[in-house]
Amino acid sequence: NGQWFAAFTGTYVTNPSSLDIDHFVPLANAHESGGWSWSSGTKSSYYNDLSDPQHLIAVTDSANSSKGSRGPDEWKPPDSSYWCQYADTWIDIKVRWGLTVTSAELTALESMLGTCDGPPTGVYVLPAATSTTTNTATTASTTLTTTVVPNPGNTKNCSDFSTYIA
């Protein structure tokens, strides 16, 4: 019993079966933007990266299905208030892993960064979770720590990454 924040939709989810753990930069996108040249060890490090709390994040299964392997030039989170953080995180992961961006991807990222209130900080502050069990609302701050990655379903499995063909 608990709550998980689904960043792409800006909602709290209480049913864990409606969540997916998503590679922020999808495996196919990473492959196409330079991951194809990685050793199997580097690929394994990428798809199991728990050193960055934004690399693998909890999202609603519907948002994850909608995003698929698309980059920001083809898909944006439904919650536009998350666009600044989304672009900042996307860029951070691409830079950290030495991945490239297309010109269309760069244009989309620049547009999304244009929604920032100031320079991106790299820190996303979760909105307060509210619940009403009586006539009064209670507010709590929630931090999500994920250590076990569930099966991503029948779309692409992490083990498929090493077999991607350009």
How should each PLM-predicted stretch be described?
Residues N1:
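Active-site acidic/histidine clusters and adjacent loop/turn architecture
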Residues W4-T130:
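Domain-level detector of nuclease and nuclease-like folds
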Residues T130-V148:
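Extracellular mucin-like PTS domains
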Residues L144-I165:
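Extracytoplasmic/periplasm-facing segments of secreted or lipoprotein envelope proteins
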